[in-house]
Amino acid sequence: MDVTRLLLATLLVFLCFFTVYSHLPPEEKLRDDRSLRSNSSVNLLDFPSVSIVALNKKSKQISRKEAEKKRSSKKEASMKKVAQPRTPLSAPCVATRYSCKPPAPACCDPCASCQCRFFRSACSCRVLRLNC
């Protein structure tokens, strides 16, 4: 009984090893230098050369200034987006969290939208954007 269990355990270990080894991509399989040299399909001359350029202090300062300008312009753009005028409210409208099935009028809150679920059987006005 112990011999059969030992054989089954050995077989299981070999199957696990074979499964893992067979699923490795070709790049990860172990190879020696001879096979890499002879079977290499990728030629190192095909890749473009890399040139390293040292930056001087002026170029670093210019890039910092440009980065600061971009940051300030992004902040100004975000401030402009916040100050959008709100649309005037229409008289017949649906309050937030109430039913707004398609024959009903639009939601009262300009930041809210009508959200339907269960094949448009349950619809309600919900605020989806917090910073509207």
From Swiss-Prot:
It comes from Semnopithecus entellus (Northern plains gray langur). The gene is ASIP. Residues 63-79 have a biased composition (Basic and acidic residues). Its main location: secreted. The presence of a 'disulfide through disulfide knot' structurally defines this protein as a knottin. Glycans are attached at residue 39. PANTHER family: AGOUTI RELATED, AGOUTI-SIGNALING PROTEIN. Involved in the regulation of melanogenesis. The binding of ASP to MC1R precludes alpha-MSH initiated signaling and thus blocks production of cAMP, leading to a down-regulation of eumelanogenesis (brown/black pigment) and thus increasing synthesis of pheomelanin (yellow/red pigment). This is Agouti-signaling protein. It comes from the Eukaryota.
